[in-house]
Regions:
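Conserved N-terminal beta1-alpha1 strand-loop-helix module at the mouth
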Residues: 1-202
Length: 202
């Protein structure tokens, strides 16, 4: 199972996650986010990361050509589209995850319109694109028949239950692991990773 920590802004937080066994790290290229990181800064962190850790870049309503440019410049493995992008705006090359904000039954026909490797299911908000720290009704995420990365308010206290109920392809945590926006609490990171990885192997 993929265990991703999103909102990485510095080398120390990235290393703490790697030390805990993380399988994917997320870098947010959305300037309105308190977890924004400039692509050139992300590239300097990414170049020191193990090749086995997936580097995921999060974008919100960015033109496909610009997404591809940043993906190459920063050394990303995966592009995560977090905004309101229509299927035709998915980059024509490379691996893509599409975020779906779950406020009711999943529209599987809409999911099928995307050429996405996986779908990240997150809590909806009228104010922000992710990072709410709030969970949603996990029953909406079951039985999709698609690769699901479960997000939205996950931490060490609830990730085991989330995995048991949803059986996702991956889990993603961000704001609940922070000491302040953009800064990870390394104890929370370690506890989350231990809980998620141990549950995934049971």
């Amino acid at each position: 199972m993929i265990v991703k920590i999103c909102g990485i802004t510095n080398r120390e937080d990235a290393q703490a996650a790697v030390d805990g066994g993380v399988t994917a790290l997320g870098f947010i290229f959305y300037e309105q986010s308190p977890r924004y990181i400039a692509p050139e800064h992300a590239a300097r962190i990414i170049e020191r990361l193990p090749t086995g850790v997936w580097k995921v870049g999060l974008f919100v309503n960015v033109a496909p050509a610009e997404v591809v440019r940043i993906r190459k410049a920063a050394g990303l493995d995966i592009v995560q589209l977090q905004g309101d992008e229509p299927p035709e705006d998915l980059p024509a090359e490379g691996r893509v995850w599409k975020t779906m904000h779950v406020d009711g039954p999943l529209n599987t026909a809409r999911m099928d319109a995307y050429r996405a490797e996986a779908f990240l299911l997150d809590t909806p908000s009228e104010e922000v694109y992710g990072g709410t720290g709030c969970t949603f009704d996990w029953s909406k995420a079951t039985g999709t028949g698609r690769r699901i990365v479960l997000a939205g308010g996950l931490d060490a206290e609830n990730v085991r239950a989330a995995i048991r109920q949803v059986r996702p392809w991956g889990v993603d945590a961000c704001s609940r692991l922070e000491s302040s926006p953009g800064r990870k609490d390394h104890v929370r990171v370690a506890r989350f990773l231990k809980a998620a990885l141990s549950e995934a192997t049971e």
